[in-house]
Amino acid sequence: MQQGDLYDHESLVKAIKQVDVVISTVGHGQLGDQGKIVAAIKEAGNVKRFFPSEFGNDVDRTHAVEPAATAYATKAQLRRTIEAEGIPYTYVSSNFFAGYFLPTLAQAGATAPPREKVVILGDGTAKAVFNKEDDIGTYTIKAVEDPRTLNKILYIRPPSNTLSFNDLVTLWEKKIGKTLEKNYVPEEEVLKNIQEAPIPVNVILSIGHSVFVKGDQTNFDIEPSFGVEASELYPDVKFTTVDEYLNQFV
């Protein structure tokens, strides 16, 4: 275990000199400070791959409004810095963490999936991607020494985990054997709610708008020039499907 302080350049360089790969998992508050990691990697000169703290939407292909837009812009700016410095990288676009959204079907303030009513942002047709956190970790480690992921975006977008909100609700209804009352929230109302909501509700809503209304996780094709898809690269990995994941809540 190598120790280094994000805010102590010398200690960071010393730690990074002992490794070949740097995977950053800093939280929201430190996203902008990853430039310090880039500077240390540049000075150390030995790192073969850097994975910045991404693990969400592809920040170069988003239609997010504030306040999510600022967080995405911070990540995008770091990408440009990494590229300008010539540091070998992989950006992991893992889309949604299943554990954050599926236990409640993304219902605000809920502690369990809905049994009577469900709120759906937009018309429910935009497709989103839900991946179990363990599987995201597995795919990330697989990518570490894979030349196919070098200087590429690794999208974790298995077809069986790519569902519209309507698909998700239908799947859940089949499992519990009943039909839910559906409340569709039009985009104009979603945007109004974002502007009026306090932190962190406005952040969550703006991410929901980006994904469930604008379809930012799936409204583009993965082109070989910039990206690869994890379940295609590693068909041997047995990942948890959304269908399987929801069984624990029935």
Regions found by a protein language model. Give the residues of each.
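Amphipathic terminal alpha-helices
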Residues: G227-V250
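Oxidoreductase cofactor-interface core, primarily capturing Rossmann-like NAD(P)-dependent enzymes
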Residues: M1, Y7-A15, H28-G32, A44-K48, ...
